[in-house]
Structure formats: C-alpha cells, structure tokens
Amino acid sequence: DCEQHTDCSAASGPVYCCQDSDCCGGVDYICTNYGQCVRHF
C-alpha cells in the first residue's frame, strides 16, 4: 500500500507518489513504478 504522497510545498521537491495525480507540475509529470515523479516529453 502506498501512503506517502508528494509534498508540493517541500523545498526538496517530490518525495513519493502513488499515482500521476500526486505529482507536482500537472500532466507533464508521471509517477514511475518506483514511486518518483519524473517529467515526460
């Protein structure tokens, strides 16, 4: 179970994501299968 979500207010940036909507930056970012947000082009 994934309970850690991205904290968009953290200066260090995203922590963990469970789904794409957890990512900061909108549709430009996706949640990878290892729980980090990455930008896709």
Swiss-Prot record:
Lineage: Eukaryota, Metazoa, Spiralia, Lophotrochozoa, Mollusca
Tissue expression per record: Expressed by the venom duct.
Domain of life: Eukaryota
Broad class of where this protein is predominantly found: secreted
Free-text comment on this protein's domains from its UniProt entry: The cysteine framework is XI (C-C-CC-CC-C-C).
Listed GO CC annotations: extracellular region
Keywords (A to Z) from UniProt: Disulfide bond, Secreted, Toxin
GO molecular function terms listed in the Swiss-Prot or TrEMBL record: toxin activity
Post-translational modification: Contains 4 disulfide bonds.
Subcellular localization, as worded in the UniProt entry: Secreted
Keyword flag Cytoplasm: no
Function: Does not elicit any observable symptomatology in C.elegans.
The protein, known as: Augerpeptide-s11a
